[in-house]
Amino acid sequence: MRDNESLFRRRTLLKRAAMAGLSLPLAAQQQDTEAFRRIGETVVHRKIQPWFPKAGMGLFLPWGPCSVGEIEGGWGLFRDMRPPNKYWPIEKYMALADRFNPQNYDPEKWLVAAKQAGFKYTAFLLRHHDGYAMWPTEYGEFGTKQHMGGRDLVRPFVEACRRVGLKVGFCYSPTDWLFNPKGWPWRGFPLRDPEFKYRRPERSRGLPRYADMPIPQMQKYFDQLWAVVKGQMSEVLTRYGKIDLLWWDGYDWPAGIDHHGQELEDYVRKLQPDIVLNDRNMLWDKGRTLGDYSTAFENRNPAERPKGVWEQCEAVCGTWSYEGESPCKPASYVIERLARNRAWGGNYMVSFGPRPDGTMRPVFYEICSQMARWMRHSGESVFDVEAGPYPERSDVPVTIKGGTWYLHFLSPTQRAATLTGIKPPSSVRVLRTGQAASWKEDGGRVVVSLPESVPAKMDEVVAVS
């Protein structure tokens, strides 16, 4: 869902071919509770709410009329971004909203399963790039007010989060590909051309190469869009009580204009002072991003330990929103990614797209059930923990809590872990079984071995203290 240039190119190539280190000692390592993001020469620091780095895992819920058409978000609108059977002209796409009727919508059922699986926070899609609002907004002309009799899909979700005990988070795209204020030549200007081919800003020159309009006229367009965005923010951030997280997506607007990014961020923090914001409210022409933490790792793994507070987001079923009964990665994969991210001080945002009728696929509950079994014995190793010295002083990922090191055996073939710079332990045990694990000193190193009686399971964790 991230609309950055490199991701766009990589994703396009893939889809055409097939388908958005820290120094020791440990006390000085993560968790660093300052956001750190560098673009060009600008670094943005801001204190983040302490719950977020401790939380570890979030549930992303992208949903909307696109789910009816079994297409990913609004990307089917672009004829050059999808194969012919996945391309939806504007009129056909907008007609999906008349068929979007989640009569079996029961968010509490989703969230109970998610809570048991270890998820701590959420990001419910309020509006994606197609501009469809999931609540009866007074701003804009595409949403439940026009197509669902004014039904509010947001309030039941918020109330269910609070009953279940999950942090309330929203995902919102200020970009609106279908925004069509009176007097403009076509919908979606200037992020597309009249044939709805995807175009992007030429940031390096500060000029919008995709629009044959002067900057003042373009500025007028964005001022009108800003009024809609601000109005919608005023609704969702005052109607539903305390909101813990706002996950921006797609604020990728052209250079050379004021797209109100800083004003938007300031306005949100005025309405919700304790809210956590990601870094996708972008100010490309000013050489920096805003927000509290980095979301640089979308559907890809970091090659080295990222700096500061960060989150990886991933569509484990192949696409963000519902695209039919596509295969999903197994629970063991989700647990492994969570463990690796936590060992480097990051969070993991996992995406599952609900069906258009409001139900979740059975595979969602299967994955959550398997994760819940693992969480019952090993959840302490991934929540409210610090990053460990991996790979500097351990050959397996390590998380730390107090005086305990949690060793994550992620490969079924690895039966021993080697640690350096650690005192001889007083206790070494397998979390899943409670059995003692053997250890020995070897040339100033400590080698911890899994008991032979312990079969290889997903992320076998050994606690060393």
Which stretches of residues belong to each language-model region?
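N-terminal export signals
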Residues: T12-Q30
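Short alpha-helical segments used as structural interaction elements across diverse proteins
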Residues: S6-F8, T12-L13, W51, F124
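Mature catalytic domains of secreted/periplasmic carbohydrate-active enzymes
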Residues: Q30-S465
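N-terminal secretory signal peptides
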Residues: M1-F8, A20
